[in-house]
């Protein structure tokens, strides 16, 4: 017999139009100051802050509520050094043959290269893994759905939570990055999705002078 789904009353916040407009505008202005940062301070951060950030990310919606993600938090200097060494090896290959000339030209305004010192300087690395399937205690495999979309949304929540905490982050995607699965000893059903250094910005940190697309370029109303 099919089990009847359990439901509870929705208890989310609701606002009158004026307050709604004010809150949405304030949040937009706050998030518009979020920037990708590559110059980190090694200043310590309480682990509890990172835990809150990760748990916020875990509130993201997911296909069939499978929550197909694992957030691996790394602060151990030796492990961070291994990750940097492996990442720089892949990035060296990317910058010296794997990337197209067009790609390299698009990266020029950011001043990036294969050196990734932030992987050791930032106090925490959050490595996001996607889970193609879950493994039950008896070894049975249960498929997950819309894994890429679900984990991508969770990463958006993660970045917003990092900004909300007054910290900065970098979305780093060395390619390929299967070395993360090996270094962090993750099971076969998990694959690395995103590597996110988290911390305070270094004193005097600089970011590229960029402009975001305006409303007309990103929004269509019917």
Curated annotation (Swiss-Prot):
Record: residues binding FMN: 34-38, 61-62, 171-173, 212
Reaction(s) this enzyme catalyzes, per UniProt: 2 iodide + L-tyrosine + 2 NADP(+) = 3,5-diiodo-L-tyrosine + 2 NADPH + H(+); iodide + L-tyrosine + NADP(+) = 3-iodo-L-tyrosine + NADPH; 3-iodo-L-tyrosine + iodide + NADP(+) = 3,5-diiodo-L-tyrosine + NADPH + H(+); L-tyrosine + chloride + NADP(+) = 3-chloro-L-tyrosine + NADPH
Alphabetized UniProt keyword annotations: Flavoprotein, FMN, NADP, Nucleotide-binding, Oxidoreductase
CDD domains to which the protein is assigned, alphabetical: iodotyrosine_dehalogenase (cd02144)
The protein's enzyme class: oxidoreductase
Function field: Catalyzes the dehalogenation of halotyrosines such as 3-iodo-L-tyrosine and 3,5-diiodo-L-tyrosine. Likely to also catalyze the dehalogenation of other halotyrosines such as 3-bromo-L-tyrosine, 3-chloro-L-tyrosine and 3-iodo-L-tyrosine. Activity towards 3-iodo-L-tyrosine is much stronger than activity towards 3,5-diiodo-L-tyrosine and 2-iodophenol.
Name this protein carries in UniProt: Iodotyrosine deiodinase
Species: Haliscomenobacter hydrossis (strain ATCC 27775 / DSM 1100 / LMG 10767 / O)
């Amino acid at each position: 017999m099919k089990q009847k789904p359990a439901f509870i009353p929705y208890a989310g916040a609701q606002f009158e139009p004026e307050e709604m407009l004010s809150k949405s505008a304030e949040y937009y202005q706050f998030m518009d100051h979020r920037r990708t940062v590559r110059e980190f301070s090694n200043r310590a951060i309480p682990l509890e802050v990172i835990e809150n950030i990760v748990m916020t990310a875990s509130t993201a919606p997911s296909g069939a509520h499978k929550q197909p993600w694992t957030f691996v938090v790394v602060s151990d200097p030796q492990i961070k050094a291994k990750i940097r060494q492996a990442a720089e090896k892949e990035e060296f290959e990317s910058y010296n043959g794997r990337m197209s000339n067009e790609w390299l030209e698009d990266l020029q305004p950011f001043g990036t290269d294969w050196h990734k010192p932030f992987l050791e300087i930032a106090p925490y690395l959050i490595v996001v893994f996607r889970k193609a399937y879950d493994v039950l205690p008896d070894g049975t495999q249960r498929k997950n759905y819309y894994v890429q979309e679900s984990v991508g949304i969770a990463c958006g929540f993660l970045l917003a939570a990092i900004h909300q905490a007054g910290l900065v982050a970098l979305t780093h995607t060395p390619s390929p990055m299967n070395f993360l699965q090996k270094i962090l000893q993750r099971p076969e059903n998990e694959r690395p999705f995103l590597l996110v250094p988290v911390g305070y910005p270094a004193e005097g940190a600089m970011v590229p002078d960029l402009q975001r697309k305006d409303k007309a370029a990103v929004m269509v109303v019917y």
